Each structure stands twice: as structure tokens, then as C-alpha cells.
Amino acid sequence: MTGFPSIDLSLFDIGAPWRDQVAAQVDSAASSFGAFLLVGHGVDSSLTDSLLELGGKYVKRGSGAELPGFHDSVREYATSLTGLGHKLMAAMARGLRLDDGFFADHYTGNPRVSLRVGDYPVALSAGGQPDTDEAGNRRLLTILKLGDGARAQVKYDEGWLDVPALPGALLCTIGPVLQRLTDGHYRSLPRRLSRSVAGERPSLCFVFEPGMGAALTPLAGLRPRAAEVEAGYRQLRAGALLTQSDAT
């Protein structure tokens, strides 16, 4: 097993052969680890830092309290992450030997997106050890910015694998919907978040989903992991699949 993958997405905009190189890196990480770190992602660090700070205040005040500038920052950050989601899907399409716009044309032209701030409350257990919050990724992509003191792990073949701390990086994880679409070529693995200190953890969790009504037909010939993927996927529409996921 090699180290946890880190990908510089800024190279994707330079053009060939860098575009192909990044696409190959994304394809390898998504099919092996089901997750990867992103640097050079183009998300304004000052916007991220501001939202993390405001998110801490938001958690303390409660969701019903007014917080000047908070909702504007949320919308701006979500807009930036939506653009990042589209770029990632273009890189994945290229890595799968498809047109860059394949996913946008068929699934994500009008994506459903959501952003959660401080969505992983953690209390210290008896003895001072941090409790752990396990999360099953149920969407197309999830892009996480971890707050101070937070750490993430991905359940790999050999057990829980620590995601290294990399300043400014975002953690992207593959959701079951994308595993289905790629017929098991991409892996959707459990992840969990924990923290090393007490108090709130205003991590930012952005979810990128296919548009409602998009026909989720698995792509053929992508080397499915037969032992881990259920046989006989039937064609579903995004709304029906998300409803099923929410019920589990």
C-alpha cells in the first residue's frame, strides 16, 4: 500500500499532458482508496478561514441565532465548492476515458448541493479519550474541510487509515452513488472523524449530488470489484436512490 494520495488540481487547468496526469491520479485514488486530498483546488483560503471562524460562533449560538455575514459566507463557499465539484467530475470523466463533460451532460448539469457547518459534534468520553463519529458517505462526492483539532480516517483494506494533515488541503471522498455509476470501479469506503480537543468542531462538509431525476445507469467495462459490489444494478433515478439512502 502506498501513502494516502494527494493531488494538485491546479495542474488540470494547464492543459495536456498535465490534464491527463491529474485525471489518471484522480482515477487511481478513487478506485484504490475511495478518497484523496486536494491541494491547488482554487478555493480562497481567506473565505474558508472566515467561514470556519463564523462556524464556531454559529455552533455556540445555535442555528436559530442571527450571525452577521454567516449566510453570505456559506453561499459564497458553496458556490466555490460547486465549481470544484464540476472540475473533479470532469477529471474523473477523463480518467474513465470519457469526454470531460460526460457527467455534467448526464448527471450533474444541475447538481443538488448542500453544506453543513459544525455537523460533527463530538463529546469526550470517560477517561479523556475522544469519541469517534463514523459517517457513511451516501452521495456522489463529499468534500471536507476539517476544523482545528479534527482528524479523519478512511476504512481501507488493512483497517482504518489516517488521513495526513496537510495545510490548506480538502478531503474528497467517493459516495455510493458514484460507486454505482462506475459499476464498482470507484470505491465508496466508510470514513470517520474524530477530534483531539474538547469543544465545537466547525468542520465544513460539502455534498455534491446528481440532479434530481438523472437516470443512474452504471457504466460498463470499468473493472468492477466483484467481491464488494452488489450484482445486477438496475437503472434508478437520483431521487429514488437518495430516498433509499436516507432510509438506511
Question: What would you call each of these model-derived segments?
Answer:
Residues M1-G64, F70-T248:
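C-terminal flanking tails of non-heme Fe-dependent oxygenases
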